[in-house]
Amino acid sequence: MNIKKKSFLFQFLFGWIVLSSAQWLSVLDEAENLNSSFSLESVDSFAPVRPRFIIDEDFAEDYNLTVDILHRPLQENFDSFFPNVEAYVESGNSNGDLMSDNGKLDDLNSRAAYSALKALQNSYGSSHLYRFTPYELFGQSIWIEEAPEVNHVGWSIMFDNLGRYFLLELRGLREVTFALFITFSIVPIITGILTVYIYKKKYCVIKFNKSGRSKKKDSWLKRSKDELLRTDSANLLTLNDNDEPVMIRHSCKRTCILFATLEYNIPEWNIKIKIGGLGVMAELMSKTLKQYDLVWVVPCVGDITYPVAETAPSLVVKVVNQDYEVKVFYHYKDNIKYVLLDSPIFRKRTSHDPYPPRMDDISSAIFYSVWNQSIAAIIRREKVDIYHINDYHGALAPIYNLPEVIPCAISLHNAEFQGLWPLQSSIDEREVCGLFNVSKTICREYIQFGNAFNLMHCGVSYVRRHQSGYGVVGVSNKYGQRSWVRYPVFWSLKKIGQLPNPDPTDIGLSVNPVNQQLPDFAEYASVRKENKRKAQEWAGLTIDDEADLLVFVGRWSVQKGIDILADLAPTLLEKFNIQLIVVGPLIDLYGKFAAEKFMYIMERYPGRVFSKPEFVHLPPFIFEGADFALIPSRDEPFGLVAVEFGRRGAICIGSRVGGLGEMPGWWYSVESSSTAYLLKQLEKSCTLALKSTPEMRHKLRIAALQQRFPVDEWVALYDRLIRNCIKAHNKQQQRRSIKSFFSCITPNKPTKDVNDILSEKSAFSPADYEHSIDIREHTSYDANSMDNDSDEDNYEQAESIISSLSSSALSELSYISESSMNIGSRLDERFIDANGVAIRDFSAELTYLTPENSKGKLSIDHFLNKVQSRWHDEEHHYYKTGFRKRVYKYLKIKDKKSKDVDPDDDLVNQLPLNAYTKPRYKSAASTRLNIYQRILYLKVFTWPLYTIFLSLGQILSISSFQLSLLSGFEDNNQISLYVITGVFILSTIVWWGLYRNLPSVHSLSLPFAVYALAFLFTGISSMSLPYHIRGWLSYAATWVYAIAAASGPLYFTLNFEDEHCSGLGSSITRACVLQGVQQLWLSFLWLWGTLSSRLDYNYKVLLQPINSVYVVAGVWPVSFVLLSVCILLYKGLPPFYRQKPGSIPAFSKSLLHRKVVICFLISVINQNFWMSTLISQAWRFFWGSKLTKLWKIVVMTVSFLVGAWLIIFYVLRKLSNKHTWMVPVLGLGFGAIKWMHVFWGTSNVGIFLPWAGIAGPYLSRALWLWLGILDSIQGIGNGLILLQTLSRRHVTNTLMISQLAGSATSILARFVSPTKTGPANVFPDLTGYTPVDRAKPVANAPFWICLILNVALCIMYLRCYHRENISRP
């Protein structure tokens, strides 16, 4: 839906509801007024009805009485009167003065005017004034019998203190109220749509790069090689400007670097194991880092026969407390020492598949445990200077040598994969730690992240603790920063650096490329034409010089966007004369479906498409003959393919993510992760490229040929990285030494260091798999050959021991980095189409393939999401409910005969940790879950029953901004507010503590018991008891309710955690449904509070206990239901909510490193400081008017909060299916919408609309409801921002902290805020404005500070959202 249609829809929606409601209700009012006891013949038809003035509270305090600050009853026994505006009273005015110096009371309709009236009364049309006591005036009203002109809003009163009389002066302009009404109605919509438009134009663009890398990035070419590689003349190295220098001693010894990779090459043995960028960079390191001594640790794979090599003492590692031998062989080449590790677990891998297929099962745990322990032993044996870690595979190795530490550098080639195993219980922790041979203490201090054993986090923790966080780099200029933004494991670091990969073929420093001789156009075109023909012949395509040759080379996976290319291919083939070559190895299910689709496309377009889903060594003419290189990656750390094609003259078309976008070509931004958006962006880019002129293409190719990604630049940056890592390590060691020295001096202040951690008792005793970290060398080895035979018995023994593990699959968890949102509608890893039904269905439907449905119904992502939804539904029934039999189409069921499964089978290796150790039988649900859990898993409209109950907890809760709802509903009840806020703060701390220390089932079920107690007290307070007892019970009910309401953030963040993510659309659906219901609930709570407020005999406002059996009959069943929900949740919440809370080292530090958290906290504090004291008055404006009928306001409320909300919800969901950023950006685009909402309800502007006639009160409240809806949309957007920028654990803690800060700010606002006693000049009353006043009403600092802060925070929040959004690459 485009912007114009969206704007029209919002304006039409608002206009239709407001005008129709106002006109309909005004007709009813007009009919009733005709039968009233007074005459309207002399009253202008545009004037409001029922005026009155109310005396000031300050004057009443002189008589130890408090006047009625609610709406006073009116006297209707006058035949004629001036129908003026309804008035409110505040305890004070903006400046503390009751009257101006000239005796003039300005602004009849302002709060100051009502406060200044004192006890003055007009006696039967005379202007003479009399003074009465407040008690005598109770129930009285002041009447002005002359109406103002239609162009004015009210009167100003002139007092004569000596003569004791007053004069009236016309004040206010109806044009002002009309302008404010139109502004508040339309401006938020206009600014919201304008913000969306600007955001889309700025970020959702296709960048045409016609020159390649920026001049700044190529500035190194102006320097000589000596300057580039020259080390500092001094003995000092620097990390930061404010760091103290650390001396590095010169040594003749060359720096020794150890790195370990699963991809490697040994040229003299003709061995090359390489599938990606990591293998390329490992090979480059071995060729170019001649100034270092390199120790390269590699495993032996099963399909390669290795020559005889030098043998070395074997290593003995532990797996589940069992010794396991790893043989070691050495091979030397120049400055490289190859360390080859030989063991059965490594031999199971092949040269084409060196990595374990999963990283959350038993086989992979054994693999990486043996791998990392072996690396640790080699580090200790070789005495290296620094260990270079590549990705997560070897990140665990350094902790095995603690307390000895070594400098480390970490290169992130693909940070999305981190090496994860579940730690959902103490049993999981014991078994996984046993697999990896680490103690529980080390696991918690270094490795554990949430409820996962995270290898990448181990490396990050090691660098953070021992190098002050320095040493982690990305492989491109942007990838490091984006990795820091997207993955929570890096948030404890201040930043991630950059070490951009080079082009391995760009060897040597050449002259400035501008001075290079450019090829002749005709000659170059002839060479390209010949190479293009060779490429067409190689691929079996039709020889066609006029056809544009498009090439895709890469892994066939969702990350590389192969499904997007397959969906778009029919459209491109129909519209343009193109040929397509698509090659690369299959990786995941998306690649499998893309291969099936390309097979059909090849048959449909013979001679135009070549598809080969396997790893292929491409000849050079493929790169040199391609017209365009297609790179539709959803995420790309570096993008070596773009460099390889671009530097050979191909023009690039692809996504501008990670390291992509620096070569000449068309690059589209990936602001949204939805497939529909990516398809549209790729189609636009291809269209622009294919329609470009030959001259433009030649210029782009020439620019591409000049691009430089020199190896020498990378070597210089690598040198700096190594030096600084060693410096950071030495500096941290000095700090620890100083710290240890002072610890010895002051033993009363012990510090916990690595030695202390290791000295603690391990979790694994001999009787309970306890062990010390032990990696021993074994000397029994074959000294003559390097064969494939090894200690199979040991390995089989280890496998037999660990086969009893029963941990759940990590894919069921979503707390790590919300990775299910990182690539949009990404398929869950557990669905592998095991029975092949999905691929057969897809193949059958391809017979109806067209260019249109290829991007819609037959889109790979769309089809797999539909299948996945069906598969999850079948799995949900089979494993979680199973109350009735049904036929399963996509779920593969194992029978009892499948108990013994071969662990070597590829399918088994892709199953969760407990998939084959505990086979699932036919009665899976009844054997795994109790009856309560099965009941709560039953679905109601796709929502499991437990999610509905948890949603109820969110609906019943209130925020710190709404605390005055429970404080007696009136501003003068300060003590009640302080008590409520104090209870709310303490309760927040209690619920937060339960969440962090106990399984979440406790913090999610117990609040319902507290809610039940609150409703029980409410019922008791309505019984025939002494008045003071019922009053205290009413207050007790509110206090108890506040205790339960403080748990609200937990229900927001923890709900739906056990359900599989269905994309952002489902999140918006849930948010809109819950927000709509919560709005209704809060609205009627405010109505209840307004109606139940009363005066005692001293005219003090109290919460009136209603003595009625109907109240008991209504609230006690609710209390019983809530108590039942508590019991059901405690017994029936899914196993996910029963796992122990996981720890995250340096969690507070990581939270404060996120700017969106800081911005959110400031926003909450700002709102509570300026507006929390006024929320009750705003709701009094809505519900408490005497100018409206209550039932009509109820109808209007339901119409807006149900009817209008459903329409808005439908529109927002549709828009978010394509643009995942739409709702957050639209909400922030509304600007200071909460400020407008409070302004309209508290500044008297909404009380009297002279241009609207008797429909004015309803029209005014319709606008207030509309502003409330827009405020709710902004609130939903803010919630989505938190979910799209933080992990759920971070969101929970952020909301808890903000709740505490907001509550404390609410109390502070009652003392120091300019709005502590009323709107004051922060929300000035403009109803008395005249041109003579000029800018006086708004010429005050608090007004502008409040307004500017609210607008500025929206802008800041939007910038933080764009920069820290983890749902985009």
Curated annotation (Swiss-Prot):
PANTHER family: CELL WALL ALPHA-1,3-GLUCAN SYNTHASE AGS1-RELATED, CELL WALL ALPHA-1,3-GLUCAN SYNTHASE MOK14. Gene3D superfamilies: Glycogen Phosphorylase B. It is an enzyme of class 2 (transferase). It catalyses: [(1->3)-alpha-D-glucosyl](n) + UDP-alpha-D-glucose = [(1->3)-alpha-D-glucosyl](n+1) + UDP + H(+). Keywords: Cell wall biogenesis/degradation, Glycosyltransferase, Phosphoprotein, Transferase. This is Cell wall alpha-1,3-glucan synthase mok14. CDD domains: GT5_Glycogen_synthase_DULL1-like (cd03791). Disulfide bonds: none annotated. One of its GO terms (molecular function) is alpha-1,4-glucan glucosyltransferase (NDP-glucose donor) activity. One of its GO terms (cellular component) is ascospore wall. One of its GO terms (biological process) is ascospore wall biogenesis. Its EC number is 2.4.1.183. Belongs to the glycosyltransferase group 1 family. InterPro entries: Glyco_trans_1 (IPR001296), Starch_synth_cat_dom (IPR013534). The keyword Lyase does not apply. The gene is mok14. The modification Phosphoserine is found at S219.
